[in-house]
Regions:
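Non-cleavable N-terminal signal-anchor transmembrane helices
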Residues: 6-8, 24-27, 105-107
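Bacterial N-terminal signal peptides
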Residues: 12-25
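Sec-dependent signal peptide cleavage junction
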Residues: 22-36
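Beta-rich interaction/scaffold domains
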Residues: 33-64, 70-74, 81-160, 164-220
Length: 220
């Protein structure tokens, strides 16, 4: 029987420790241990709303969104599509909704040979202005945006933009899109001029999980 020397035993112990350490490294996970894709449980939208981007969470390289449609392919309340811009997003809008109501958007995500089926409840309601008041200088622009998200003013106006939101609503972004094709960031309580282009205001109601895009422009 061959005698095992101390250096051989030490080498074996070191190798075992290294293998054990590799197993403890964060991020070294099997395919089965990866988190499954998920989607928001529910959202609220006004009728005739712009595209809202919905991100699919826990997407990984190689995952593909193969389907994004309203339940029963019924587009009377809401429309849904796969995104042309990002692999982990879908678009939802109510451009062509003929009625209010509640339905679901169904999404399929292919991961390897497995298909993950997701669903999100969508409640579509009639437009109610989220603004308590809105002025540009001395011009009351709130009147124009009372019944629609796309306000057409009778004439151009300039001055300080002053917007107060209703309870639960906040402004997340204001920008102006002009004839040059470039967007310019604006701020509430700062001077604006509608002759430079349409003003877009993104607002959010966190509790309802509702994000809307409002706009102001002079009539053409």
């Amino acid at each position: 029987m061959k005698k095992i020397n101390k250096s051989s035993i030490l080498s074996l112990i070191c190798a075992a420790v290294m293998m054990f350490s590799l197993c403890l490294i964060p991020g070294v996970k099997s395919e089965a241990a990866a988190k499954a894709p998920t989607i928001d449980k529910s959202i609220v939208m006004f009728r005739n709303s712009y595209n809202r981007t919905i991100r699919i969470k826990n997407m990984k390289k190689g995952d593909v969104i193969t389907k994004a449609v309203p339940k029963g392919n019924d587009y009377s309340i809401v429309s849904a599509y796969t995104s042309d811009e990002r692999y982990n997003e879908i678009w939802v809008n109510t451009f062509n909704s003929s009625k209010s109501g509640t339905t679901k958007v169904l999404v399929n995500v292919k991961r390897g040979k497995k298909t993950c089926k997701l669903s999100m409840k969508v409640k579509v309601i009639s437009f109610v202005s989220p603004m308590q008041s809105a002025k540009i200088g001395k011009t009351n622009v709130k009147k124009a945006i009372t019944n629609t998200a796309d306000a057409l003013l009778k004439k151009n106006c300039s001055g300080k933009l002053t917007i107060k939101m209703k309870k639960g609503w906040t402004i997340t972004e204001i920008y102006q899109f002009g004839a040059t094709g470039k967007s310019i960031k604006l701020k509430n309580n700062k001077k604006v001029n509608t002759s430079k282009g349409r003003i877009f205001i993104t607002v959010k109601n966190k509790k309802a999980n509702q994000i809307e895009l409002l706009s102001l422009a002079a009539g053409y």
